[in-house]
């Protein structure tokens, strides 16, 4: 009817959407389709909520609340089989949501532009401290469009892909700034290996929760690694992905020696360290050793 939330967003009547609504109603009446819809995690990609929209005047406040409300209503836990996440009642300095089953914590970052090579984050010192302690929340990156207030892309980065290698220290704020001398940081998304950016929604196409959780599980071998080791492993994973080859040689990874030396300036034995990480990735079934210095990236 005209007062339904759907029509409050799109207007009434709206022939553009009426066909889709009729089709959906028809599909739901089909027992097979209905059973399928029950068994998979169904998402509504529309962010719009009239009550939230009217409650706030600035668009920045509106989109922050709309994205948080959408996330809590629609998102599941990628780390376990829990189908809902809950928001912290009192805003924590870092995390926004948590899983009531496995207690994983998540931070949500939302923006209307596609995420580029880097994103702004908080205080540099706090970020480094959090990485060393291992209590950094997992990151969700939500990309939306204001054309129809809907989600276009959503990805999650497990916290064990966070290392000093992906943190860029920013210049201190000017003496005239309100927080003079404060030092922030950027997250260098371009330095995170592909396996560390798990796609949940891609170009408005929703990935099945089973696929998302499988991809999460495939990299969970990093979970119990300490910060310095984790940084080295993920940096080597990035080098492997950068080669963009299913099979590669040890010498090809050695070609990243200078790149790795810049990321780990205190380590003077780069080649032995490379071999150590490759051995670890072999042990974790991420790589297969073919012999004679050749490796194969296993299907993920």
Q: Can you name each region flagged by the protein language model?
A:
Residues 258-274:
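Short, positively charged loop/turn segments that connect secondary-structure elements
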Residues 64-74, 87-93:
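Short, flexible, mixed-charge glycine/proline-rich loop motifs
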Residues 227-247:
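Positively charged, polyanion-binding regions of nucleic-acid-associated proteins
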Residues 77-80, 99-102:
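Short cysteine-rich clusters marking metal-coordination/redox-active sites
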Residues 272-300:
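Charged low-complexity interaction tracts in eukaryotic proteins
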Residues 103-122, 126-135:
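Short metal-binding segments enriched for Cys and/or His
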């Amino acid at each position: 009817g005209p007062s339904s939330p759907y029509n409050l967003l799109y207007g009434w009547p709206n022939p553009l959407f009426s066909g889709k609504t009729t089709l959906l109603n028809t599909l739901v009446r089909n027992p097979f389709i209905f059973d399928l819809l029950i068994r998979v995690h169904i998402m509504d990609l529309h962010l719009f909520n009239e009550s939230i929209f009217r409650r706030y005047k600035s668009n920045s406040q509106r989109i922050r609340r709309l994205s948080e409300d959408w996330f809590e209503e629609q998102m599941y836990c990628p780390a376990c089989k829990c189908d809902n996440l809950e928001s912290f009642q009192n805003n924590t300095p870092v995390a926004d949501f948590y899983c009531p089953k496995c207690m994983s914590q998540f931070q949500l970052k939302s923006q209307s532009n596609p995420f580029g090579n880097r994103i702004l984050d908080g205080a540099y010192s706090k970020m480094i401290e959090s990485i060393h302690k291992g209590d950094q929340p997992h990151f969700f990156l939500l990309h939306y469009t204001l054309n129809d207030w809907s989600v276009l892309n959503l990805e999650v980065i497990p916290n064990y892909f966070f290392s000093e290698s992906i943190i860029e220290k920013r210049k201190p704020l000017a003496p005239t700034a309100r927080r003079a001398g404060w030092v922030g940081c950027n997250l260098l998304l371009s330095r995170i290996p592909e396996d560390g950016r798990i796609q949940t929604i891609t170009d408005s196409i929703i990935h099945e929760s089973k696929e998302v959780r499988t991809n999460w599980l495939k990299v969970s071998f990093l979970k119990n690694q300490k910060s310095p080791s984790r940084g080295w492993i993920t940096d080597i994973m990035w080098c492997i992905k950068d080669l963009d080859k299913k099979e590669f040689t040890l010498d090809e990874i050695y070609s990243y020696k200078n790149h790795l030396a810049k990321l780990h300036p205190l380590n003077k034995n780069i080649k032995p360290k490379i071999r150590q990480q490759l051995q670890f990735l072999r042990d974790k079934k991420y790589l297969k050793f073919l012999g004679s210095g050749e490796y194969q990236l296993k299907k993920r």
